[in-house]
Amino acid sequence: MHHMWYESNMIDECWHSILQALRSAPDAKVKIKICFNYQTYVEEPTVSSPKRLLEKWDSHPLMQDYSPELTIKDNNDPFYNIADWRREVYDPEAKYTVWGESDTIIPRDFFAILNMVEIDQPHVLTFAGRPMWDNSWDVVTHERLLGYDKPCQCKPHKDDCIELLESPWKYKDYITQKELDKFNDESGDINIKSVPHKIDGSLVCISSGHKTPFIAPGMHFVREDTCFEYVCRKRNIPQVCVTSRLKGHNYWHPTKRVGTDASRNDEVFKKYAAESQAAMSEFLQNLDK
């Protein structure tokens, strides 16, 4: 897990979700790695000590009971963000290297499923999502939520048209762990199927044996999941999806950012994002299988 200081208010929810899944799979061998990122290159703080926003979680049960490997990044280091972390943390010998995000909670049986799955080739495993902004995401949408997602036909296009859908859960809805567990408990047996490549970085399980790098060396953040998806396509790495288990990616989390007024519309953010996307384009153009 890579946590920025301004994501602090989501950590308790995220970590308790991981704890629940760990305790539900006592036989699974899980090594937890966490990066606390205190850098302020992009987001200017409105609080006196961004560091304290993350340090307060040192006594959390996840820290105390499972002793994660902790990495610290601050302004004494060059610019470092989630794409750097994901590029560096991959373990080609581990059964799975899992990407998570601060705004995402996981199914109770997440680690039990990973412990159970046996696929004898490099692959990527994902968990089902909610209806997104267009039908291209249907291939990785939970099987009980299909049939609701329709692209906007308005002219001009309206980004919020999905609000009109009748789906019980949409990508903009905030879902709690209790609600996620109830939905998944009612979803029956584990169904895993091969799907066309469609990856979002909120919860991705990357098997052993992948050729690296699969994220452009010059990428720091923004679209590293897209870069990985394109690499999988080019290298014919299959994707499978647990279509009967919903992940809880709270894209519009009510406490997404604390201690800063910065947003993705800031010029500094756009500058770093453009650099990362340029690095991705160059990397993919020169990629061989």
Where are the regions that the model predicts?
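Short beta-strand-to-loop acidic/aromatic patch adjacent to the donor-nucleotide binding site
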Residues: A94-I105
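Active-site-proximal specificity loops/subdomain of glycosyltransferases
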Residues: T40-A94
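C-terminal catalytic/acceptor-binding lobe
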Residues: F183-K289
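A conserved hydrophobic helix/loop-capping motif in glycosyltransferases and polysaccharide synthases
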Residues: M1-C14, A21, I34-Q39, G129-R130
